[in-house]
Amino acid sequence: MNHLRAEGPASVLAIGTANPENILIQDEFPDYYFRVTKSEHMTQLKEKFRKICDKSMIRKRNCFLNEEHLKQNPRLVEHEMQTLDARQDMLVVEVPKLGKDACAKAIKEWGQPKSKITHLIFTSASTTDMPGADYHCAKLLGLSPSVKRVMMYQLGCYGGGTVLRIAKDIAENNKGARVLAVCCDIMACLFRGPSDSDLELLVGQAIFGDGAAAVIVGAEPDESVGERPIFELVSTGQTILPNSEGTIGGHIREAGLIFDLHKDVPMLISNNIEKCLIEAFTPIGISDWNSIFWITHPGGKAILDKVEEKLHLKSDKFVDSRHVLSEHGNMSSSTVLFVMDELRKRSLEEGKSTTGDGFEWGVLFGFGPGLTVERVVVRSVPIKY
């Protein structure tokens, strides 16, 4: 049966990203948020929110939901109003559309006919429906009706690592497979007005943005037709951190997606991440975490700061994660793929020798509900100038 499997590791062959056109400037967002939610009388809470926004290190975010949508659906701004139907009616349409935009960019970079796509993986925590966003995205792209689809709902911020893990397994165990993996989240699922009793909501309103990212994954790239690897996916792993139950979560309720985020998350991640690294890199003989490149989900500034401090990382190791956080906020599952895209583009622009900032080996981390950690050991490829 070995002839049915590919030889060699799977690689990322193309990356595409997409965001809604509507832009939220972080400095202006506290005034905007309290105005559109008719909460300007809550002056003390607004000042708390302004401090959260100021500390976020976010410059701007993209957001599908605009004032016109709020005028059409005025109940969305109320804190506990039953608005799930209105949110889902928007998101079951918009999530596949934004995902399709990212896919189209990845397919264009790949340069091959879309008829060569054999598998489609889609993940989103924004909506749930049957048939799912995978079905609608495939239809929008005009993919073959025989494309093998996988739909994963409610993974959250670690989902970017999950789609790479599954795409790698599919590509390596099905010779000739080309897997289109998509992450898309639109935060209209959790937008609502403020409450003095719900400070976790304010954190979510301050950091989350909308985005989609797509990658094409395959083994044995066919260079004769122009396929070029960007990163090799060497190994993968997933773990639930000890004593972390209830620290990150989301719950679908009549008011939409209710978000949980405990203040101990940065500490939990920083205290446990080295164990994940040791398990991943001991077989390769690497123990210097400054000798690898980092593709890290920037869940928030505090997570990056704590990990950097704990592992004594050089300040440039999270430059791509910090850039994506600044320009887009936390886009849930797609964010880490934005970081991957930023890394390979910056490496080229700065004349680095590899797609991994001049380093051969690297790691991709996603953190999310559970508290779950996804990690992928990644190998860069030389850049030919």
Curated annotation (Swiss-Prot):
Q: Which CDD domains match?
A: CHS_like (cd00831)
Record-listed E.C. numbers: 2.3.1.-
What protein family is recorded? Belongs to the thiolase-like superfamily. Chalcone/stilbene synthases family.
Per the record, its GO cellular-component terms are: cytoplasm
Residues annotated as the enzyme's active site: 157
Instruction: Name the Pfam families for this protein.
Output: Chal_sti_synt_C, Chal_sti_synt_N
Q: Name one GO biological process term.
A: polyketide biosynthetic process
**Which tissues does the record link to its expression?**
Expressed in male and female flowers, and seedlings.
Localisation per UniProt entry: Cytoplasm
Q: Does the keyword Transferase apply?
A: yes
- Where's it mainly located? cytoplasm
Top-level taxon of the source organism: Eukaryota
Q: Which organism is it from?
A: Cannabis sativa (Hemp)
Q: Which InterPro entries match?
A: Chalcone/stilbene_synt_C, Chalcone/stilbene_synt_N, Chalcone/stilbene_synthase_AS, Polyketide_synthase_type-III, Thiolase-like
Give the function comment from the record: Polyketide synthase responsible for the biosynthesis of secondary metabolites.
GO function term, MF aspect, one? acyltransferase activity, transferring groups other than amino-acyl groups
> Keywords, A to Z?
Acyltransferase, Cytoplasm, Transferase
How is this protein named in the record? Polyketide synthase 3
